A protein has these predicted regions:
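Short loop/turn segments at beta-alpha junctions that line or gate ligand-sensing/allosteric surfaces
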Residues: 88
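Charged, low-complexity intrinsically disordered terminal segments
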Residues: 1-82, 91-103, 108-252
Length: 252
């Protein structure tokens, strides 16, 4: 488990740095604060290496944080980066606002993913500011080929990505503010290497994990509408099959 916020940021930076083909990021909240810019900078650096980057963000953050923001516009304007917003806020349809994307994970290539409760903001990544949230993430590494849960997560992402509820976020005009923001994010990456020198080292991913027999991911329906409680049913079924259960949740 990743329990430390600085370690959580370093894992993201290292995973993105080592990506050769693809980076997938899903998050509920993404801010253009210090931690958010760190991740943006890493994504842009990866895109410049011809890594295909896809980012999906919930519509509330899309409305409050991304709308017209020059840093997100810079990110979306970068070649090899695609950005979508799940269920964008529509003030004419307030009844749709309860359908939110709370998924928070990072996938790189076909070898690893990080999944948990951390948003992409100062509250969850690094030690920026006076307040930090306490959260946990699980890191999964597939030693040889794709693991079953990695395939499951990638398939889940593709379904969410292709939903009609997931709308493309585009840079409509590359203004001076956008170009200056892009330059700032590009120049930020060498500073990250100095701030977090561990990402320059070789990581033994296998040594950082514990072998498991199986990892299974559960989810509710993904459409932006009222949903059947599939998760509740699945958890109840699992609780009936074992002698011991451990549940870790930030919400109760």
């Amino acid at each position: 488990y990743i329990t430390d916020n600085t370690e959580a940021l370093e894992y993201r930076l290292k995973m993105i740095r080592e990506a050769k083909e693809e980076v997938i990021v899903s998050t509920f909240d993404f801010n253009a604060d210090t931690g958010g810019k760190d991740v943006m900078s890493a994504l842009i650096e990866a895109a410049h290496r011809n890594v295909h980057v896809r980012l999906i963000v919930d519509g509330i953050s899309g409305f409050l944080d991304m709308l017209g923001d020059p840093y997100f516009q810079a990110l979306a304007s970068t070649e090899n980066i695609e950005v979508k917003v799940y269920n964008p806020v529509n003030l004419l349809k307030p009844w749709t606002m309860q359908a939110r994307l709370h998924d928070k994970y990072v996938i790189t290539d076909s070898s690893m993913y990080l999944l948990g409760g951390r948003n992409t903001t100062n509250l969850f990544l690094g030690v920026y500011g006076k307040h930090q949230n306490i959260d946990k993430e699980i890191f999964i590494y597939a030693k040889e080929g794709e693991s079953a849960s990695l395939k499951q997560l990638k398939a889940y992402f593709e379904r969410v990505w292709e939903l009609s509820d997931s709308k493309e976020y585009r840079c409509k005009k590359k203004t001076d503010r956008v170009q200056n923001s892009l330059k700032e994010l590009e120049e930020r990456y060498p500073k990250l290497e100095a701030l977090y020198p561990d990402i320059l080292k070789t990581w033994d991913w296998e040594a950082r994990t514990v072998e498991t027999a199986k990892v299974t991911l559960l989810s509710n329906p993904i459409e932006a509408k009222n949903k059947e409680p599939h998760m509740w049913y699945s958890v109840n079924q699992l609780l009936q099959t074992g002698k011991n259960a451990v549940i870790c949740t930030p919400y109760i």
